[in-house]
A protein has these predicted regions:
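Glycine-rich loops and low-complexity Gly/Arg-rich segments
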Residues: 34-39, 80-85, 194-196, 230-234, ...
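Lipolytic serine-hydrolase domain surface
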Residues: 64, 205, 211-331
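Conserved, well-structured beta-alpha core segment at the onset of a catalytic domain
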Residues: 1-72, 325-331
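Generic detector of well-ordered alpha-helical segments enriched in charged/polar residues
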Residues: 30, 34, 131, 155, ...
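Aromatic side chains
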Residues: 59-60, 140, 181, 310-312
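Active-site catalytic motif of lipid deacylating hydrolases and related acyltransferases
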Residues: 17-18, 32, 48-164
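Serine-dependent carboxylesterase/thioesterase catalytic core
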Residues: 4, 8-36, 134-242
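Solvent-exposed, charged interface segments at domain starts and junctions
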Residues: 90-95, 161-162, 167-176, 256-262
């Protein structure tokens, strides 16, 4: 039986701006999420196949000066690596997830992975990841024209969703998470004409993946940093649920717990609807099996990149929460 998804919209916003073209990025994210959901909800995934408009990408990579999208050969290899992540998710099902009561070392050992080597390997990708992250963060901070262009796709996607009567969810990876935070803050608090109309609108779920928002230096870039003494204006007030995911070895989200920084003070201010469970959750020390595309510059280096978005998009808990949203099972 066809499912009515007419009021649903999953808005996806990527991280560091070295990216495939917009259409390739969108399709790889859509595919990974749909296949994640398919593991536990085959009929729902079939409905998503028939309703691709449920997914929208807020693509901002081309807002960065001198951006050159990845070429077709790289994109083909990337798609193969994404397929490997999907295959592992299908094969081991919910055992893909590191349980909250499970010993992290045992989880990785059971999968033939040496935890020490995994963490050491993550450091070999650290310089490349952090160099790109710091360069783009500096642009976001120092050039407001570029920052406005980076925020614009998500702002447009949210306006469109709300104007169409949809209940949007935001999935934000890496730098996309603090771009999203700024956008949500502006929709909650700005009184100019292009924002005031939406002051009362909300997102059903804000999902941060590999997020650097735990870093004080990142939070200092945000609009909210100028309102730390103004209670409600410290935070976006338009988030119904906030779930944060951090993979083991991810050098960007190493500050993995948002409870003290965001969740507890937001609950104290009653910014999450009252008397509901699971409004804010930290999922930490997660398994990200993504292996980078091999090229001449990295043949002898560790191939795992625990920060990569595709390993986050395959997380079982994310799949089950999105299924609950799409099936109207969120309380």
């Amino acid at each position: 039986m066809p499912l009515d998804l007419s009021n649903k919209r999953i808005i996806m916003i990527h991280g560091l701006a070295s990216k495939p073209p917009a259409d390739v990025t969108h399709e790889l994210w859509r595919k990974t999420l749909t296949e994640n959901i398919r593991v536990g909800h085959r009929q729902l995934a079939k409905n998503l196949d028939a309703n691709p408009q449920v997914f929208e990408t807020a693509y901002w990579a081309d807002a960065v000066p001198h951006h050159i999208p990845d070429d077709a050969a790289y994109c083909r290899k990337l798609a193969l690596q994404v397929d490997k992540v999907i295959a592992e998710r299908r094969e081991i099902k919910d055992r893909f997830h590191v349980g909250m009561g499970e010993k992290v070392g045992s989880f990785f050992k059971d999968r033939g992975l040496d935890l020490v080597k995994l963490l050491a390997g993550a450091l070999t990708v650290k310089d490349d990841v952090m160099t790109s992250f710091l360069r783009e963060t500096e642009l976001y901070d120092q050039d407001q024209y570029i920052a406005d262009r980076i925020r614009a796709p998500l702002e447009s996607a949210l306006r469109r969703a709300w104007d169409e009567g949809r209940e949007p969810v935001i999935l934000a990876h890496s730098m996309g998470s603090f771009v999203s935070y700024d956008v949500l803050w502006r929709f909650a608090h700005r009184k100019t004409a292009d924002f005031k109309k939406y002051n009362g609108k909300r997102v059903r779920m804000f999902v941060t993946l590999g997020s650097p928002l735990g870093e004080p230096s990142v939070r200092n870039l945000l609009f909210a940093t100028h309102h730390q003494d103004h209670s409600l204006r410290q935070f976006p007030t338009n988030i119904e649920r906030w779930h944060n995911y951090a993979c083991l070895g991810d050098v960007v989200s190493h500050q993995k717990n948002f409870h003290d920084i965001f969740f507890q003070p937001m609950r104290k201010l009653q910014l999450f609807p009252a008397n509901k469970n699971f409004r804010s959750i930290d999922y930490a020390d997660l398994h990200n099996p993504f292996e980078v595309v091999t090229h001449a510059g990295n043949r002898n280096r560790e191939k795992r990149n625990p920060h990569k978005s595709y390993g986050y998009l395959a997380q079982p808990r994310l799949g089950s929460w999105l299924a609950d949203y799409l099936l109207d099972r969120l309380l």
